[in-house]
Amino acid sequence: MSKISNSGGDSKNTLYCSFCGKSQHEVRKLIAGPTVFICDECVELCMDIIREENKSSMVKSREGVPTPQEIMEVLDDYVIGQTYAKRVLSVAVHNHYKRLAHAGKNADVELSKSNILLIGPTGCGKTLLAQTLARIIDVPFTMADATTLTEAGYVGEDVENIILKLLQSADYNVERAQRGIVYIDEIDKISRKSDNPSITRDVSGEGVQQALLKIMEGTVASVPPQGGRKHPQQEFLQVDTSSILFICGGAFAGLEKIISDRGKKTSIGFGASVSSPEDRRAGELLRQVEPEDLLKFGLIPEFVGRLPILATLEDLDEEALVQILTEPKNALVKQYQRLFEMENVELTFHENALRAIARKAIERKTGARGLRSIMEAILLDTMFELPALEGVQEVVISEDVVAGSARPLYIYAEREKEKGSVSA
């Protein structure tokens, strides 16, 4: 039931939303039902939920596998830019799960698994793409850091622990885990230190590549349910990895130079391009990556062979970072606005303030990953003070606030009052 209150001698009744509890003065519209009221904000929230559920049901095609266009459409809701990488991933994931859906139907042709390698700078969306793909297909997902992995028998994390994590995300349902997605980050950090095979044992570099080969290609892994090291008296869960999709990602710093050097060797003669490879953006160079470049970088041939699909991501420019701040469903600006709404305060960012935040992230070379730390630093004092203040209706963030030369503007319900002077 909605609440109705009489304020002192005021004869007017105040109506409240039956769902969120906001009064008619705090919302644009309050719609009356037989015994309840609903505000425009709750109506919009309900519409978002319905749209999301409709999209999830539409994402299933006749065979139960979403089409590449449907996958790309959902990726667009969460990941800004990176059109080429999203297109490659959409096709690869569609083909992978179509292969599983038709397994055993056509025995004359056996379709092999195609794992994926994502190459792009830090903070460009590699991890988010992998997480979103798992959400679209509704399969278990786990993420591993390649830098913590070692060969079996050495101190560190065994590669089979990756499969254990996948099992845990599937609530130990082996059948579901066998259709899951594994994302291995920082894969470039396990590259060989030189082009020549290592003389000494490299247990965290080439050794890890060797250890990953079997589970990526397809094997029956014996996984201890409780994790840790194996011992003979222990019971094991048998997990077939041949249907698990492995997506590996890394920044591959320095790979552009290897590609550029290869380009210089071939750009000779009258028909050669006059533009220097160095003049091109790193993203354009990365898109020309060949398996031989990855071998020179330090990945072993067998490992490169297990990753036949290459998707490259580009550095995010200022425009893309501003879009990331404001447009996706989980956009940072929307998240902080919701936090401020809980204090009944509206949070407003000027357009030039958002661009200043984006420029800061570019200067720090942290990509989209650095946006949250910048936002936290800007809003820290405000979030500390706000719960103890009364009557604040709106907080405005300008470019000067981002630069640190001014305090946020506090607008009060009864009067407009600036919190602090123009200079900090």
Swiss-Prot record:
InterPro entries: AAA+_ATPase (IPR003593), ATP-dep_Clp_protease_ClpX (IPR050052), ATPase_AAA_core (IPR003959), Clp_ATPase_C (IPR019489), Clp_protease_ATP-bd_su_ClpX (IPR004487), ClpX_bact (IPR046425), P-loop_NTPase (IPR027417), Znf_CppX_C4 (IPR010603). Zn(2+) binds at C17, C20, C39, C42. Residues 5-58 form the ClpX-type ZB domain. SUPFAM superfamilies: Glucocorticoid receptor-like (DNA-binding domain), P-loop containing nucleoside triphosphate hydrolases. Keywords: ATP-binding, Chaperone, Metal-binding, Nucleotide-binding, Zinc. One of its GO terms (cellular component) is HslUV protease complex. One of its GO terms (molecular function) is zinc ion binding. ATP binds at P121, T122, G123, C124, G125, K126, T127, L128. GO terms for biological process: cell division; proteolysis involved in protein catabolic process. PROSITE patterns: CLPX_ZB. Component of the ClpX-ClpP complex. Forms a hexameric ring that, in the presence of ATP, binds to fourteen ClpP subunits assembled into a disk-like structure with a central cavity, resembling the structure of eukaryotic proteasomes. Belongs to the ClpX chaperone family. HAMAP family: ClpX (MF_00175). ATP-dependent specificity component of the Clp protease. It directs the protease to specific substrates. Can perform chaperone functions in the absence of ClpP. This is ATP-dependent Clp protease ATP-binding subunit ClpX.
